[in-house]
Design a protein with these regions (language model features):
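Short, low-complexity, charged amphipathic interaction modules
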Residues: 171-191
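Acidic (Asp/Glu-rich) sequence patches and key acidic residues
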Residues: 1-172
Length: 191
């Protein structure tokens, strides 16, 4: 069970992302973000410096992309809480990846992506901005509930969210039907 949200669009980087960062971010995407003990990571994973962001584990192993088991979900000795992310992270899974020609940030297409705006802000603050990468563009979302729609707008790494009507989803409606739908969603429409 859970709640699925669909995304359309991508954010463009100001320059192609270096291969090492693409590899890191896309591995970050495929590992469960669990609260960990940094000392235990260093003890259990001798190559830990290759399994984190620029040799930095961050707080509670937030930058660690190693681990045991499927998608790094195994309960090795470094895991403090399997169902709780590091205190600096918004959730257990980050589903933003770098794609295109290493010049776009986009949804990975997976289901049940929660805290997507918070994850985007986290990635900008922790990975992209410090390395001089700047994102711009729009990504629309549409959740399972009819009123769960909107646009994530990013301009020069500043994230703005517009909740409400996703006009694209109503493009096939005639004017009267669109007005009725908007009023049903609580909007007051005047001509």
């Amino acid at each position: 069970m859970g709640y699925t949200t669909y995304f359309d669009g991508s954010l463009k980087f100001n320059k192609p992302v270096e291969d090492w960062l693409v590899e890191y971010i896309n591995k970050f995407n495929t590992t469960r973000r669990m609260k960990r003990d940094n000392a235990k990571i260093k003890e259990l994973f001798p190559d830990w410096e290759k399994l984190c962001f620029s040799g930095n584990l961050g707080e509670e192993g937030e930058y660690f992309i190693g681990g045991l088991g499927y998608y790094g979900q195994g309960n090795d000795g470094s895991v403090l809480d399997h169902n709780c992310p590091a205190k600096t992270q918004p959730g257990l899974w980050c589903q933003w990846i770098i794609g295109g020609d290493n010049d776009e940030l986009m949804w990975d297409g997976g289901e049940k992506f929660y805290d997507y705006v918070e994850w985007l802000e986290y990635m900008i603050a922790n990975f992209f901005d410090p390395l001089g990468y700047v994102l711009n563009g729009d990504i629309t979302w549409e959740g399972e509930e009819s009123d769960d729609v909107g646009v994530i707008h990013v301009e020069d790494n500043v994230v703005d969210v517009e909740y409400g009507v996703h006009v694209h989803s109503m493009s096939a409606m005639d004017t009267d039907a669109m007005i009725k739908e908007l009023e049903k969603r609580g909007y007051k429409v005047t001509a």
